[in-house]
């Protein structure tokens, strides 16, 4: 049985949270950029061009690709032959999310109790999806889930 300290999980999750908000997956920028030539609509080409410009600007300035860094969603494949020492897995993940979002100066937008609407100021708790898999390793992936616009006004339908 392999032992993995919870501090290693915390450190890894912190790095993943920052990276997920600052860098696109490999090849994604090129995919969007390549779509510009194939797109028929001038408006769509313009929007895709703006997205590529935003990606480049964010990389140059070292800031998040989107201002809505959202809720941290963590996917974990935990080997059945792993023993986590120290803190509980969920606590280690949430500590990593807090470190990543606070140290990375990412937008803190999670509320503890939705009815009170009080911000936790560290973007926890995260949504954590776990799978127990064969082996003695832990594989972690972070995916920020943006929230979109919070001040929504729905107009009444037009009557004919």
Residue map of PLM features:
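Flexible, glycine/charged-enriched surface loops at secondary-structure junctions
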Residues: 24-32, 43-48, 62, 102-116
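A generic, well-ordered mixed alpha/beta core segment in the N-terminal half of proteins
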Residues: 70-134
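Residue-level detector of conserved catalytic or cofactor/ligand-binding positions
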Residues: 152-160
């Amino acid at each position: 049985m392999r032992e993995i300290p919870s501090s290693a999980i915390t450190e890894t999750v912190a790095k993943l949270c920052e990276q997920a908000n600052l860098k696109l997956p490999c090849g994604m920028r090129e995919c969007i950029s390549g779509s510009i030539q194939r797109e028929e609509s001038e408006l769509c080409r313009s929007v895709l061009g703006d997205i590529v410009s935003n990606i480049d600007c964010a990389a140059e300035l070292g800031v998040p690709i989107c201002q809505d860094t959202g809720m941290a969603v963590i996917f974990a494949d935990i080997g059945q032959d792993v023993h986590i020492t120290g803190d509980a897995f969920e606590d280690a993940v949430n500590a990593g999310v807090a470190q990543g979002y606070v140290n990375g100066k990412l937008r803190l937008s999670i509320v503890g109790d939705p009815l009170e609407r009080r911000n936790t100021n560290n973007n926890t708790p995260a949504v954590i999806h776990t799978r127990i898999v064969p082996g003695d390793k832990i594989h972690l992936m972070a995916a920020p889930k943006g929230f979109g616009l919070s001040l929504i006004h729905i107009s009444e339908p037009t009557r004919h």
